[in-house]
Design a protein with these regions (language model features):
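Glycine-rich phosphate-binding P-loop
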Residues: 35-48
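ATP-dependent small-molecule kinase phosphotransfer cores
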Residues: 68-125
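Extreme N-terminal starter segment of soluble prokaryotic enzymes
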Residues: 29-32
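RNA pseudouridine synthases
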Residues: 120, 136-139
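Short, Lys/Arg-enriched N-terminal segments with co-localized hydrophobic residues
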Residues: 1-27
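Conserved phosphate-donor/acceptor-positioning beta-strand/loop module used by diverse small-molecule
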Residues: 139-161, 167-175
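Short beta-strand-centered segment that lines the nucleotide-binding/catalytic pocket of NTP-utilizing
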Residues: 57-68
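Small-molecule kinase domains that catalyze NTP-dependent phosphoryl transfer to phosphate-bearing small molecules
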Residues: 86-93, 166-211
């Protein structure tokens, strides 16, 4: 085990099954990376940059269209339901909006999302952002689960720049989004969101620069 920034650790089994990467012509094994992240930590940017350098698919909001096609719901509705809890209260989330079978619209979106994520993982190496992908692919031996987090001040600063917000509004946005992500994740997985035990690598973007985080993930493909 290697420790970086108190929470970065590796637990990697090297397997066969190699394919060719577009990055510097290196050889890499087929690998699926899931990235869960705190809002404002830069996890989306890191995942997107890794996918560009390796020339492999990157899935985040582009999953929404596939989920919408499976469920018949609008893309706007799926966007709201696929990663963020509609309520900030676990009790309300568990019981509101269910039909006589006990199923809610959120449950239908989650079921379709799970199927889409598993189908995408069968197509080859890729990066998947959020949406409980770490849980849905937890039994795949060729998959590594990353959690990206950061210090509050730096996350607030990043959110301010991205959305042109005041410090107060950026802080509120970060906390609200993370609370909804946590509730959604913990409701559907029965696991603690951000638990290092569920990830092979935890990256603190306040202690490690973006390039170093990207390089750590690239190493998983070699």
């Amino acid at each position: 085990m290697f420790l970086f920034s108190a929470r970065l650790c590796y637990n990697i089994d090297v397997e066969t099954g190699y394919s060719t990467s577009q990055e510097e012509g290196v050889t890499m094994k087929q690998t699926i990376i899931t990235i869960s992240r705190e809002f404002g930590s830069g996890g989306h940017f890191i995942g997107e940059e890794v996918s560009k350098r390796l020339g492999i698919p990157f899935y985040d909001k582009n999953i929404i269209q596939q989920i919408a096609e499976k469920t018949g719901f609008s893309e706007d509705f799926v966007k709201e339901q696929s990663e963020y809890a509609p309520s900030k209260n676990m009790f309300a989330y568990a019981f509101v909006g269910r039909d006589h079978t006990g199923s809610s619209l959120s449950d239908q979106v989650y079921a379709a999302q799970t199927q889409v994520i598993r189908n995408l993982s069968e197509k080859g190496s890729c990066i998947i952002i959020g949406r409980c992908a770490d849980y849905n692919l937890k039994d795949r031996p060729d998959t590594y689960h990353i959690f990206v987090y950061g210090d509050e001040y730096e996350k607030i600063s990043r959110t301010q720049q991205l959305f042109n917000l005041s410090e107060k509004d950026a802080r509120a946005m970060n906390r609200d989004m993370d609370k909804k992500r946590r509730l959604h994740y913990e409701y559907y997985t029965d696991r603690k969101w951000g638990d290092p035990g569920n990830h092979c690598m935890c990256l603190n973007t306040s202690a490690l620069d973006m390039e170093r985080c990207i390089r750590y993930i690239l190493d998983l493909f070699e």
